[in-house]
């Protein structure tokens, strides 16, 4: 029996892949008894050959049931997504960098990692400037940009203190001088441009 517009396409298409022994209709191994922690590697993997050989027993069942791929998506929705693991090379670089830091730099690094601008405050400031509601993602991004900006100003001020031979509790004049030095580098937008026309 042929269905669809293509010839040679049988009604027995698009269902459960062949070769999934020991799995229930959702593709979950029966030996796990509902525990999805440790799936068997070989038995329940969906391979590209299996996707091409999908079969179904009857037309009514295929029309009412969602495809196998869609069932898999809904099954994994409730599970925690695993975070991608960090490369060993990246971890090695980070440990090398941290071991090369002095005590002062390490304490500053830890404080910098822990600090963050409050998202609600950033969103309210952005709303007062734009006059529109601000999406949460935009407030988070702006808070991150502000943190980087403050870090650059502080680093410039610390470099100036080191150049002048001063000790690090930064004074307001050091921060003002750092801002003045960063303006020509293009870090600050110039608000005082004259409009020619």
UniProtKB/Swiss-Prot annotation:
Protein name (database record): TATA-box-binding protein-associated factor 11-like protein 14
Tissue distribution of the protein: Expressed in fetal brain and testis.
Lineage, opening ranks: Eukaryota, Metazoa, Chordata, Craniata, Vertebrata
GO MF, one annotated term: protein heterodimerization activity
GO biological process: RNA polymerase II preinitiation complex assembly
Xref: InterPro entries: Histone-fold (IPR009072), TAF11-like (IPR045127), TAFII28_dom (IPR006809)
Record-stated family: Belongs to the TAF11 family.
Region named Disordered: 59-88
Biased composition (Basic and acidic residues): 72-88
Entry's Gene Ontology cellular component terms: transcription factor TFIID complex
